[in-house]
C-alpha cells in the first residue's frame, strides 16, 4: 500500500498536469490576465467576479479530478504554477474564499462539529493534529495552514458510504477493518488523514462508528491512528447501531480469515516452487536434494491443509453469526409486530366485535326488507296504471304511426329528387337553335312548315328589320 507521502506526490503531479492543460491557461495572454492582481470588488465588480469565478472553479476542478481533499496555500501555488510562473496574488484570492466560506480551515471545521465523545476525540482529532502539526507551532503558518472545501468533503464522504453499501451483502459486512477499507479505495489516492476526515463527516451523520483497540488506555499523539482497528457502517436508510462486544468478535474473525487466506496463497506459491526444484534435482540426478525438498513439500502441504481447514471453519462461523443475526432481526421484528398488535387489540374487545357484527347484520337485513318493499310497491303501481290499456290497440296504433312515417319519408325523398332535378335543368347551358341530333325534315314537311310560317306572319305585326333578316334567312334555308 502506498504511504501518504507517495500519494501526495502523485496527486501533486496530476494536479499540475491537469491545471496546465486547461484551455484558459494554455493561452499565455489569457493566463497573464488570470494571474494578475485581484481588483477591488467595489471599483471593478465585473473583473473581480470573473477572476473569483475562475479560481473557485479551478479549485473545485482539481479537487474532484485529483481527489485533493486537504490543501495548503503552498501546495496550491505549486499546483497552479505554469512554465515556472505562479499566481503571486493567490493569498489574496484565498482570503476572499475564506470570507465567503468557500474554503474553511479544517481545524475550525473539526471544532465546529462540537464532538464530545471520547472515542472520536482520541481516535481522530489527535491523529489529525499529528498529521498536520497543528499541535505544535509552525514557522510557516500562513503557507502551511490546511484548508478544505466543505461541499467537496460532504460529497466525497457520501461517495465513501455508498461505496461501502455496495459491499454490504450480509448482516456482518457492515463491519470492516480499517486496513481493508483503505485497500478498497486504493484507486482513490487519498491519504489516511483525508480518509479520517471523511469518516468524521459520516460519524456526524450517524453513519459510522469507530472500533478501537480497547487495550490502549492512553492515546499517544504519535500513534498515527493505528489504534483504529475497524469501522462499523450503518445499513442503508438506518442509523449506525451502537458498538457491541460481538462486533469486535466479528472483526477478529474477519481479520483471522483474511490472514489465513493470505497464508494459504503463500503456501501454494512455496509448494509450487519446491515442486519445480524437485523436478530439477531429479533431472540432474541429485537424489538426496530431491528427497529433502520432497519432505519440505510434504510439510508445507500439511500446514496448508490445516490452514485451509481453519479458514473453512472460521468462514462457517461467520456464516452462522450472519444467520443468527438475521434470526435476531426476524425475532425483533416479530416482537415489535406482536407488541403493536396487542396495543391495537387493547382498544377492541370480543364483545365489541360481536355487537358491531350483530348491528351490521340487522342493518343489512333491514335494508333488504326496505328494498323488497319498494320493489313490490313499484310493481303494484305499474300494474294498476296499465290495467285499462288495450295492448292490441296500442300495437295497431304504433304500426299505423310507423306506416305514416314511412310514407311521409318516401314523399319527402321524391320531392327532394324533383327539386334536385329542376336545379340541374336550370343550371344546364341554353341549347343552340340548330341541333344536329334533331331529324332533318322531309320536303312535304318543309312545305307545311312554310305555310304555317306564312300564316303566322300575316296575323302578326310587321317584324323589325333584324327579324326580317332572320326570316329571309329562314326562307333561304
From Swiss-Prot:
The keyword Lyase does not apply. Keywords: Coiled coil, Cytoplasm, Protein transport, Transport. Residues 252-280, 382-428 form a coiled coil. The keyword Coiled coil applies. Residues 411-477 are annotated as: Disordered. Residues 411-424, 465-477 have a biased composition (Basic and acidic residues). It is found in: Cytoplasm. GO terms for biological process: late endosome to vacuole transport; late endosome to vacuole transport via multivesicular body sorting pathway; protein transport; vesicle budding from membrane. It holds the Pfam family Snf7. One of its GO terms (cellular component) is cytoplasmic side of plasma membrane. Its main location: cytoplasm. Signal peptide: none annotated. Plays a role in the endosomal sorting pathway. Belongs to the SNF7 family. This is Charged multivesicular body protein 7. The lineage of its organism: Eukaryota, Amoebozoa, Evosea, Eumycetozoa, Dictyostelia.
Amino acid at each position: 500500500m502506498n504511504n501518504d507521502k507517495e500519494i501526495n506526490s502523485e496527486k501533486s503531479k496530476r494536479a499540475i498536469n491537469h491545471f496546465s492543460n486547461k484551455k484558459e491557461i494554455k493561452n499565455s495572454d489569457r493566463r497573464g490576465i488570470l494571474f494578475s492582481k485581484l481588483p477591488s470588488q467595489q471599483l471593478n465588480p465585473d473583473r473581480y467576479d470573473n477572476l473569483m469565478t475562475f479560481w473557485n472553479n479551478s479549485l473545485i476542478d482539481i479537487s474532484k479530478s485529483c481527489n485533493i481533499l486537504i490543501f495548503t496555500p503552498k501546495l496550491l501555488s505549486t499546483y497552479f504554477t505554469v512554465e515556472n510562473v505562479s499566481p503571486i496574488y493567490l493569498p489574496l484570492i484565498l482570503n476572499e474564499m475564506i470570507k465567503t466560506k468557500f474554503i474553511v480551515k479544517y481545524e475550525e471545521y473539526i471544532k465546529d462539529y462540537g464532538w464530545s465523545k471520547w472515542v472520536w476525540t482520541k481516535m481522530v482529532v489527535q491523529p489529525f493534529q499529528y498529521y498536520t502539526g497543528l499541535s505544535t507551532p509552525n514557522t510557516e503558518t500562513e503557507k502551511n495552514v490546511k484548508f478544505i472545501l466543505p461541499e467537496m468533503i460532504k460529497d466525497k464522504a457520501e461517495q465513501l458510504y455508498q461505496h461501502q453499501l455496495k459491499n454490504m451483502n450480509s448482516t456482518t459486512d457492515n463491519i470492516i477493518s480499517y486496513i481493508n477499507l483503505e485497500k478498497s479505495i486504493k484507486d482513490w489516492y487519498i491519504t489516511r488523514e483525508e480518509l479520517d476526515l471523511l469518516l468524521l463527516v459520516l460519524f456526524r451523520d450517524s453513519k459510522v462508528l469507530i472500533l478501537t483497540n480497547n487495550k490502549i488506555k492512553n492515546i499517544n499523539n504519535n500513534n498515527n491512528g493505528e489504534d483504529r482497528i475497524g469501522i462499523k457502517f450503518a445499513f442503508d436508510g438506518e442509523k449506525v447501531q451502537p458498538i457491541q462486544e460481538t462486533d469486535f468478535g466479528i472483526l477478529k474473525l474477519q481479520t483471522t480469515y483474511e490472514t489465513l487466506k493470505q497464508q494459504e496463497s503463500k503456501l501454494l506459491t512455496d509448494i509450487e516452487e519446491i515442486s519445480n526444484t524437485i523436478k530439477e534435482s531429479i533431472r540432474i540426478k541429485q537424489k538426496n536434494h530431491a528427497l529433502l525438498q520432497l519432505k519440505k513439500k510434504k510439510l508445507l502441504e500439511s500446514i496448508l491443509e490445516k490452514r485451509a481447514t481453519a479458514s473453512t471453519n472460521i468462514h462457517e462461523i461467520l456464516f452462522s453469526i450472519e444467520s443468527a443475526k438475521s434470526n435476531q432481526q426476524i425475532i425483533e421484528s416479530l416482537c415489535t409486530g406482536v407488541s403493536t398488535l396487542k396495543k391495537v387489540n387493547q382498544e377492541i374487545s370480543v364483545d365489541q366485535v360481536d355487537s358491531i357484527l350483530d348491528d351490521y347484520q340487522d342493518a343489512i337485513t333491514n335494508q333488504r326488507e326496505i328494498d323488497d318493499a319498494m320493489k313490490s310497491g313499484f310493481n303494484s303501481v305499474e300494474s294498476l296504471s296499465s290495467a285499462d290499456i288495450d295492448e292490441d290497440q296500442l300495437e295497431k296504433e304504433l304500426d299505423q304511426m310507423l306506416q305514416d312515417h314511412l310514407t311521409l319519408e318516401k314523399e319527402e325523398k321524391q320531392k327532394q329528387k324533383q327539386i334536385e332535378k329542376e336545379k340541374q335543368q336550370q343550371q344546364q347551358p341554353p341549347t343552340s337553335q340548330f341541333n344536329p341530333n334533331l331529324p332533318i325534315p322531309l320536303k312535304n314537311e318543309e312545305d307545311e312548315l312554310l305555310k304555317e310560317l306564312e300564316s303566322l306572319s300575316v296575323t302578326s305585326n310587321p317584324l323589325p328589320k333584324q327579324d326580317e333578316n332572320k326570316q329571309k334567312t329562314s326562307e333561304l334555308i
